[in-house]
Amino acid sequence: MKLPIYLDYAATCPVDERVVKKMMEFLSIDGNFGNPASRSHKFGWQAEEAVDVARNHIADLIGADSREIVFTSGATEADNLALKGVMRFYQTKGKHLITCKTEHKAILDTCRQLEREGFEVTYLDPKSDGLIDLEELKSVIRDDTVLVSIMHANNEIGVVQDIAKIGEICRERKVLFHTDATQSVGKLPINLSELKVDLLSMSSHKLYGPKGIGALYVCRKPRVRLEAIIHGGGHERGMRSGTLPVHQIVGMGEAYRIAKEEMATEMPRLTALRDRLYNGLKDIEETYVNGSMEQRLGNNLNISFNYVEGESLMMALRDIAVSSGSACTSASLEPSYVLRALGLNDELAHSSIRFTVGRYTTAEEIDYAIGLVKSAVEKLRDLSPLWDMFKEGIDLNSIEWTHH
């Protein structure tokens, strides 16, 4: 067993060796290095064919038509293209968008930008288990609502929203529905030929592919129109200009092909490892799982250890790679906005750790992590006057702290 142990697969994944091997074929002079937009020679044709094959693999995993896949630089760009592209194109129809307070920053920051442009955004509060209230969603849809954007699985707490039902609600009210499926693609079955989803964002590096490439699914029937946010050459049917990075696209395609093949066996294995971790930690006093345990990704566990400061716990756990808050924003010392939205107080939100297991995680690593977390929590609580007060039965919420 090698230290440190990587338990942060929701932040990124190593690239699968099979993917690396495939990508290497599309880089050097001996390989297939052509530009897929070069229509006049074999180098271009071979590159174009490789892109088509990858596009098909990606479409197959999510039950889409390959013509509905638009390549982007990642899920952040896909989210930007979906929200800005739709809202700007349909602004004569309406200027109202609905999302949720626990969305990824790629959605929330894009919504803030749209608000600066004069659009109106409604932010739904999640319930305490992280799920949105579908009745509340119905009640906030207006005549001028153009788009609803609700993520499939949350990046911090792994909670899975019912996108089938949300899609039905949106289709009934003639509102477009976008979902950010970055965390769920390849982990949960998604069949877009059955789901009423108009736009879906996905990433490659959360599924053992390379960083710097992602895609946006744009439904053809009923047709969804977008205003491009990047211009120059009209690639990707005018929706996203720029020379296609063939090696990255091939890598993403191969990663998605492998995921489709292995999902049925891999997800039960990951869920068993996650449950093993949970069972090893749940008996520690004053620990709370954040988010629904039923409607949840099989590889995610987000736990708050009360009376332990999250940052010091992370330092004590330097032999395991975990995160507090989400990867993009965990450099800030603000408590996680996702956990705050669930109604957790600052202390509990600050003491949360996200564990996410993946393809290379072993049972031995999980057992090591359990031992490490238990001793770290015990040690830090021994140093904590708050823990002593709690053990003495003092209600910490009733204490008036003075600020000097």
Curated annotation (Swiss-Prot):
Quaternary structure, from the entry: Homodimer. Forms a heterotetramer with IscU, interacts with other sulfur acceptors.
Any one GO BP annotation for this protein: [2Fe-2S] cluster assembly
Reaction catalysis annotation: (sulfur carrier)-H + L-cysteine = (sulfur carrier)-SH + L-alanine
Keywords: 2Fe-2S, Cytoplasm, Iron, Iron-sulfur, Metal-binding, Pyridoxal phosphate, Transferase
PROSITE patterns the record matches: AA_TRANSFER_CLASS_5 (PS00595)
GO molecular function, one term: pyridoxal phosphate binding
Pathway field: Cofactor biosynthesis; iron-sulfur cluster biosynthesis
Keyword hit for Magnesium: no
Annotated protein name in UniProt: Cysteine desulfurase IscS
Keyword Membrane (UniProt): no
